[in-house]
Amino acid sequence: MNDATGTPQRILLLGGTSEIGLAIVRRVVRGRPAEVVLAARPSERRTAAATALTAEGHRVGEVDFEATAPATHPATIDAAFDGGDVDLAIVAFGVLGDQEAMLKDAAAAAELATVNYVAGVSVGLELAGRLRSQGHGAILALSTVAAERPRRSNFVYGSSKAGFDAFYSGLADELHGSGVHVSVIRPGFVRTRMTAGREEAPMTVEADDVAEVAVEALQRRKPVAWAPGPLRWVMAVLRHLPRPVFRRLPI
């Protein structure tokens, strides 16, 4: 259960090496010790993340998670819940991919869709069952503004995240009244390892900025939040542009 200040005491980060996910963990605990479970592939980055959180005073567990293998996800979630109830689950894994390469490699595009959408559905349903059974908890699902209207320049990625976004929005409705809350977070361009070397977009933000928005959404039980906030209005315009006009935009 959350502590007396409303801070989650046990957090599961699916995508345990995600810079945004780790920033959310640090922002939500606000310096208070917590138990954090990092679910990711075994790697030096996962070990480094666990070491850093331990040094900050948290109890840290590591669970192997392979997004491309949905059949393994029930066991992954079982392992994550072995230590007790989870107060907050952060779904923060995904891949951006190379659009030009995927146009020539359908298998690569299918793998991206598996990671960004199929795996999100798989772990989302597992989490929903567990959290509903315990009667409390929250899910923060890390989507993207690209999900709102996929662009020609990244429609493979955007379409996979559109499915992810729609699933968690629907899951929020499914869980309404169960004691479990779901917030979907839609960042724009974020400076992380995943976007390194790519041309930045207007209103680019840092991982900490997304974390601030995510924690506010969690605390206020917002169903959807944009990072930065003004992107909500930008996307409202883009969503309603006529297709011939949208197609000509240099985005």
Go through the PLM ranges and name each one.
Residues 124, 160:
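Active-site helix of classical SDR
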Residues 32-48:
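Conserved glycine-rich Rossmann-like NAD(P)H-binding loop of the short-chain dehydrogenase/reductase
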Residues 88, 94-110, 153:
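Conserved mid-core segment of classical short-chain dehydrogenase/reductases
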Residues 184, 199-236:
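C-terminal helical subdomain
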Residues 53-71:
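Rossmann-fold cofactor-recognition segment
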Residues 144:
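Residue(s) in the substrate-gating loop at a strand-loop-helix junction
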Residues 17-19:
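Conserved glycine-rich cofactor-binding loop
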